[in-house]
Amino acid sequence: GATISESSRQLTSAELTPQDIRDALVGCLKNAMDRSGYDDRLLSRIAVSVQGVTDVAGSVLLWSPITEHRDLPLAGWMRRAFSVPTSVSNDCDLMARALNRREPKRYSTSFASIMLSYGVGMGLFLRGTIVNGLNTSGTEFGHMVFQPGGALCRCGRRGCIEAYAADYAIRRAARGEPEDTMPPAPADHIDFQQIADLAHAGDARAIQAIEEAGRAIGTGLCSLFALVDAFRIALIGRGTLVFDIMEGAIREALESTVGGGNINDIDIHCFADEKPLVAEGCAITALLVLDEEIADAAVV
């Protein structure tokens, strides 16, 4: 599918009521359709990306760091507004779907897409199938524990991988702030390029913070590899600006758990911008459903 129209809004999500969130979603799509010149009635499928946990059916946003509200029926809102079937997916799952379609030779059967940005998340493919939880979208890699009782995470708990590897966590450590410093809201802008520049210029605290992020990521991967064996990794987002500093710590953390394999054989590839992958993932999700409907109609 080709992009025919776009619409965006800057919102302080933490201040929004459920009705505000609903109005923003519906309004954005209506505005995009108005700009396109096409009638809303031509919509066939809607795919929504979210940062957070959805129900396994892909209808409800159960939890997200961007809002205090829970159990938001995003699919129902869009379905009622546009009379179109709607799915809701975790953003990292969508990135994994996009990579699977964009580079099928590299990302075909078993791999993980790990976002390193305002948060840390994972989309996981095993044997050609996206992995989710029993009841939720699951695979919350960023909220696996790295250091019990450690640094404060945006989720409110302590010691999560995200509390060391997200942009706010690296900035906190690079500034020498206490580990219990409250993380900023996801909408707050963090100039990660500045942190990268400091580290590349030799700033000791910035380098140490980035290396600790690498250890957190590598330790989390160790746990996964112990369960299902090693797989390819795609690191996505602005955190990849410092991959050259982070990589050694990641591979060092992996060294003791790869079951005798060579850690340098584990393919790690970087993508600096997550937004195009999320958009592709949404398009793929919607188009795959339409393909199935067309195929089923042809069989009948």
How would you name each of these model-derived features?
Residues 1-42, 83, 102-104, 157, ...:
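ATP-binding/phosphotransfer module of carbohydrate and carboxylate kinases, centering on a glycine-rich
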Residues 42-49, 53-169, 287-300:
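Phosphate-binding/catalytic loop of phosphoryl-transfer enzymes
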